[in-house]
Amino acid sequence: YVKQYPDRVVIENPGGFLDGITEDNIITHPSIPRNKLIAETLQNLKYVQRTGQGVDIIFKDMVSMGKPYPRYRSFNDAVSLTIFSAIDNTEFVKFITEVQDKNSKIMPLAEMMILRDLMDNRKEQLSELSRKVQKSLDETKKSCNELVNSGLIEIVSPYYMPIVPLL
């Protein structure tokens, strides 16, 4: 089912998540097709590709547009996805656009999510960032190091923090 509201779109699908998929690993879990009709509909909306990157695309689009993260919920008999329309932070959108234009490359999703989190929370430990981006500690540290090397965040042990003038 697709339900459209003024502030969000809710997509519901009968049946729970497939084995191994949870709300806490939906971004990084390998894609497993579940409902061909919904996949085709989302593909037509340009939110899904056949390569199994639909969740990544939805998250990346929402983050880069300054919107809340998409919300996945699993119930015993259904899964729902809520995509919000409101823009939470226009300054973050401008910032990400400037960084990507300056570097002439699209920022990876994990790095965008880390920056967004640090902008919202001002400081965070690696373990918490790892949980939020749904990656291993090593993968998250690598993303953080990229941001440190780019001059976007700094380490004030044990925290990662945004460079104040940037965010």
Predicted regions and their residues:
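C-terminal regulatory or interaction extensions
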Residues: 1-167
